[in-house]
Amino acid sequence: MRKGLFASLVTLVCLGVVMVSCNGDIDEDIDEGMVFAVNGQEPVFTYKDFDAIPQDYEEITNGTWKIKKVNGLVRQVSFCTDGVDAAPSPAPPMTEEEFFKEFMPVTADNQMVFYDRDYRDDPHYLQYYKGVPVEQGFWHFYFHEDGTMHGGDGRFIPIGQLDVNPSVNMATARKIVENFIDGSVEGEGKRIYLSIMSFPENGELKPRLVYVYKRQVWEEGEFIYVDAQTGRVLYHLGYMGGAPY
């Protein structure tokens, strides 16, 4: 069974936090030359490439605060480690916006955007870069009944400069995926959308603009990532029962 860094994507999918957008304009002309050029090629990356990325874990304590980081980025924060009824010290951020400014390298282009609230009325945020959803970029907050922020967890993907204008149109990407799976991208539980996903490059993860094909029926499905600039299939992930294969 495949495990490691990239396997976490399956967990995010099952939690329903992976972002999706529309299927795009299917009336666009297909670039048959590009489709032919990439047809039959194996995906650029395997799960071993993702598992080879170093993971540096760090835990910081400050008063009642406990902050967990992975590769220098905050992944989990608890402001009340002394118990639910204890007063946090130092005082936690008053709002989600204050939290993001303090703990994450958000920019005018790279933002956390409110998504919804769960059954406890705690807010969930999803990450967007220049209006394009970022795979695995999300944050969940937890609040006390009095409105005090208790903590949160999630993931923020730093992105410097990235061209979000695809060279490959949606129709061409759909055809590339259909050739790869030898089937249709139409049907229940299937969709394809433009997004941003990080892939291995020189020992670290670097974001790329991609088309994501998602097929999900209950706990079984697959993902295919197509480079939105070159048309190459970058990665293929299948999962069943929440576990990748």
List the model feature ranges, each with a label.
Residues 30-245:
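Segments that shape or occlude catalytic/ligand-binding pockets
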Residues 5-6, 177:
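Sequence-pattern detector for short linear motifs
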Residues 4-5, 12-44:
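Bacterial Sec-dependent N-terminal signal peptides
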